[in-house]
From Swiss-Prot:
Residues 1-15 have a biased composition (Basic and acidic residues). Residues 1-39, 221-248 are annotated as: Disordered. Residues 23-39 have a biased composition (Low complexity). This is LOB domain-containing protein 20. It comes from Arabidopsis thaliana. The gene is LBD20.
Amino acid sequence: MADQQRGHNTSDSRRKSLAGKRTSQQTPTSSLSSGGVSMAAATTGTGTASPCGACKFLRRKCVSGCIFAPHFGSDQGAARFAAVHKVFGASNVSKLLHHIPVNRRHDAVVTISYEAQARLSDPVYGCVSTILALQQQVASLQAELSVVQSQLINSRVAMANVMQQQTHHQQQQQQLVVMQQPEYSNNSSASTTLAGAAMNSFTMTADAAAVSYDVMAPTNLEHSLQPMPPHQQRRGDYQHEDEEESGADFSVAVGSTAVASKVIFPAEDFHRR
């Protein structure tokens, strides 16, 4: 009887051990299945199949409401976030973005990324080197602009001086023309007056000469040889006085003619001298 009881106990213990082994084999599979469900829930909670670039670089799970997800995509966000994390640190950037309004965070991330890239390329000046280069370029452009403006002002002043000289020269020419016109008219009137006086005196002298020629005719000469009555002698004296006056007029006419010729033709007299 005792042997039967011992065999029954050993069989029960074997059954219990097998049952324990089975349960131990089933628990890992159940834990794996529950972990897969939780991972699926996590992925569905973020709404994206892959984590953002920041979480991918940090090798952490991208939870819902990740502050880096809207600004660092999954494609190139990891490289951008690497520079930001190396220069500023992920925790500092996260704190900075939390203190900035949502509508201004994108601009902040762009500037932070640019500053990080500039700091990595130029550890001494960083983005200040770009600012200095732009300032130097602005200064050089302002200097060129000032030179061009001064040249433009000088050209305008020169053009104004040329125009003023031209107008002054034209005014002088007009004044000379106006001043020469009255002189020419006065000279012409004076010359015509002198010429007319000379012609009148010349005609008078010619008439007197004709009269004297008639007196010297042969017929008149015979009568002149005869004694003349006293009244005719008086007439002869009067004629002699008239002839002397006509001779004086002729000399005056000749002198006036010479003066008129000098006035009308001054160049000839000048050449003769």
